[in-house]
């Protein structure tokens, strides 16, 4: 330390802390008067103000480093505090930390400023509300006079709108609205397209007196208006200078599709769509003619057989606006034609039904069926009746999908009789009539049935047909020829349609002498259909002979057999024999018993794959001895479980096990202990230190030379 006569001087070391980060230390020399008893903080600040400016004193808080219980602490200081030097070294160390209340040094903001801003914003909002209300009032006032202005020229409209805008501006100024109006007002000239655009920017409501302006964007505000000298400065986005007159309510052809009392609004696109629809629907259309045309488009009942000429005549009569008397006459003519058509249709249906069924009370013929008979045609067999009794022949039934997809080339009469026995359109005759019924008709009657319908003479009466049917019913026909023909037909059917199911009767039950014939009772659809849509049943069987002796050795070339049976559940394949690893454990007797069991299971008498096994021949399953496999000892007399148990007990007791040498083995090279199996792996890479040193010398000779030098 250097001391003078008037003052003393010391070396002070200080650090500044900005945002929690310390700067590099600075060294200064401070002078202080000797009569004050030591260096004070005021003297240091005075020196710093001279060196670094006035702000450094107010921006930091100062503390000095001092000893405290064999440690160092920082002692906060004020201006009049004496700075104590460190013991031993006698140094003065100061640290300046940035103050937390730095906002107090900023210029003071008066709270009245915020209140002024709030007042100004409230005034702006009030001005906006007043402007918006005034604009709505003006629009409502002008909507009533819009109808009168449409008859005036465009120039007069603009003048009127200019005068109204001036009146509106005067009203706004009287209410305190801030409006900037230039002194030199020019005449306004606006194109008609601009007015239409301004009109379309408003949305129409249901009532004629309510028009609400649409919010405009910045792009919408740019309108092709020329020579506009009137500018209204407002804060509202809904009022743009001129108050555009509201469009008047739409007329009937362009009326929006909503009721007058609702509050629904339509925008510009919806209005254009409605205009397009209305103009398109109402263009050159006579409502009277359209109503007549709509009335003419009526579906004709399917039972009427009126031709195109009748329809055109009726349409021509309807299209001509005739008198009521002529209309009544036309209706009477049409009714007569309909009655005649119904009578002719009903008569034709009866004739066709009698020809179709051959006088039988049940069944109809299979469509698209043809039958070629080598026998000559006879006129007596043309309208042969169908038999109502059971026949001794075989009944052939086919499924619905086969009957619809495959054309039957030669069906027998029994097939037709049974296939169509469910249609009961007439009552079953009593049993006395069934006694006189003969056996089924021959193939000549079958050929007659397949004759075209156009051969029927419509002039024949029903009574004549019934008489012919009774005459034919009294005749009897030979049976042997019918049975032979039937057998040949069945062969043809079985070849062409393999999926047909044939049910053969054991003995004939009808046409016996002295026994009454039984009438057929119609059966349900489920009883008629014998086959289903599922796959056919396939069974594969194996011979019950025992397997060859070499099968258990894995040398058998036979493949496993799968059982395919129709089930509701998904099919699963059942192998005939077990996998080879399991079969090896069987003896020859067990293999033979297993093969006999599989043969019994797969026999055709048993439909299901599962069968009850006898207790004499049980199936033996192989069991793996896991304990014998896992407890194979690593070293003689000691298993894996033994040394794992010893290690676990040692860890629990925190003591080495007594037989530690027997469990873990020590490496002779490095002295580490390993399990017996791990020690062998370790010994492959463990080498003595001399070997490692020599290897490193050969690998890096320059290192050895540097050490030697």
UniProtKB/Swiss-Prot annotation:
It is found in: Cell membrane. The keyword Cell cycle applies. Residues 529-544 have a biased composition (Polar residues). PROSITE patterns: ZF_C2HC_C3H (PS52027). SOSEKI proteins locally interpret global polarity cues and can influence cell division orientation to coordinate cell polarization relative to body axes. PANTHER family: PROTEIN SOSEKI 3 (PTHR31083:SF6), UPSTREAM OF FLC PROTEIN (DUF966) (PTHR31083). This is Protein SOSEKI 3. GO terms for molecular function: protein homodimerization activity; zinc ion binding. Its cofactor is Zn(2+).
